[in-house]
């Protein structure tokens, strides 16, 4: 059972913040899933993308906001989709 403090904090957290945290978490989990499947380390990904390992680490720890452009670059480098959006028909 959650404490009253945790319940109050959750109740006071704006919906867009909850959505952001959920989506960011899903994206990071997907990136880590792809890295593991391909046998890549964060350092190897950094080298492949000409980035510092610390920058990759910040992306995957939520310390740096991932832009759509960054996600597209990650998808191109990893050869796998990270996010999927239903396309308009």
Annotate each language-model stretch with its function:
Residues 39, 85-89:
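Short, charged recognition helix plus adjacent turn
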Residues 42, 53, 68-71:
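Helix-turn-helix DNA-binding elements, focusing on the entry/boundary residues of the two helices
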Residues 49-65:
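Recognition helix of helix-turn-helix/homeodomain-like DNA-binding domains
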Residues 38, 49, 60, 77-78:
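Core residues of bacterial helix-turn-helix
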Residues 29-48, 73:
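Short basic helix-loop element that most often maps to the first helix and adjoining turn
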Residues 69-84:
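DNA major-groove recognition helix of helix-turn-helix/homeodomain DNA-binding modules
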Residues 20, 52, 89:
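Conserved N-terminal glycine/acidic-rich loop preference
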Residues 1-33, 38:
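N-terminal flexible/basic segments that precede or flank functional cores
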């Amino acid at each position: 059972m959650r404490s009253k403090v945790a319940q109050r904090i959750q109740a006071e957290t704006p919906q867009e913040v909850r959505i952001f945290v959920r989506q960011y978490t899903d994206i990071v989990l997907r990136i880590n899933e792809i890295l593991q499947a391909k046998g890549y380390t964060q350092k190897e990904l950094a080298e492949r993308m000409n980035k510092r390992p610390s920058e990759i680490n910040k992306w995957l720890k939520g310390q740096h906001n991932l832009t759509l452009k960054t996600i597209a670059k990650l998808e191109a480098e990893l050869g796998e989709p990270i996010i999927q959006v239903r396309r308009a028909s």
